[in-house]
């Protein structure tokens, strides 16, 4: 990740950063500067940290992030000049210059390995479709959480099944107008 991240930060017009990318950025001041410079270049960026990743980026503890989730998300958004999705119960979406949003959907079933990757992919797809970072993040977080809220009680939520169900549910909306 650390070998390719400088080039990705410089060249990608739209970017979602999660997991290892966030940990590498947290430990590298040069990458932090490159991340900040993306906004000035008009490059859309969304960070999707969980509380521990957010803590590393802010130089705090995860307990401090959890205690002040709104503040932490806004600070990250302002620090890196991008949209931040602080995952967890009451996922927070923060964008510089905008009021932070608290997502009303989702539940503990999303605390499953790989579901954050599904969310990152959903945000990336919306960015690729032309939505701005704040719109892409808030819509994706809502849909991701709504899928978990509607999940059948007798069925296990896995990342693979979540991705397939979201894909099937969203396919009609992605079809070109007039397509059958």
Where are these regions (language model features)?
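Charged C-terminal helix
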Residues: 146-180
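Short, charged, surface-exposed loops that flank catalytic or proteolytic processing sites
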Residues: 60-69, 130-135, 152-157
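Short, small-residue alpha-helix embedded
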Residues: 56, 112-143
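Glycine-rich phosphate/dinucleotide-binding loop and adjoining beta-alpha-beta core of small-molecule
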Residues: 1-104, 177-180
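Short pre-catalytic strand/loop immediately N-terminal to key active-site residues, enriched for Gly-Thr
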Residues: 101-114
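Short active-site-adjacent structural elements
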Residues: 56, 93-95, 119, 145-152
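Short, well-structured alpha-helical segments that form the helix of a local strand-helix-strand
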Residues: 69-77, 133-146, 159-167
């Amino acid at each position: 990740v650390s070998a390719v991240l400088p080039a990705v930060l410089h060249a990608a017009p739209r970017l979602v950063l999660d997991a290892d990318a966030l940990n590498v950025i947290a430990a590298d001041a040069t990458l932090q500067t490159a991340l900040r410079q993306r906004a000035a270049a008009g490059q859309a960026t969304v960070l999707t940290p969980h509380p521990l990743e957010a803590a590393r980026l802010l130089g705090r503890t995860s307990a401090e992030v959890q205690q002040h989730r709104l503040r932490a998300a806004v600070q990250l958004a302002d620090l890196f000049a991008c949209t931040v999705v602080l995952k967890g119960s009451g996922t927070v979406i923060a964008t510089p210059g905008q009021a932070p949003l608290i997502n009303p959907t989702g539940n503990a079933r999303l605390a499953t390995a790989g579901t954050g990757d599904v969310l990152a992919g959903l945000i990336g797809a919306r960015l690729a479709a032309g939505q701005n970072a704040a719109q892409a993040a808030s819509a994706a977080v809502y849909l991701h959480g709504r899928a978990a809220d509607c999940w059948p009680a007798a069925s296990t939520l896995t990342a693979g099944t979540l991705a397939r169900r979201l894909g099937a549910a969203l396919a009609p909306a992605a079809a070109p107008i007039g397509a059958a």
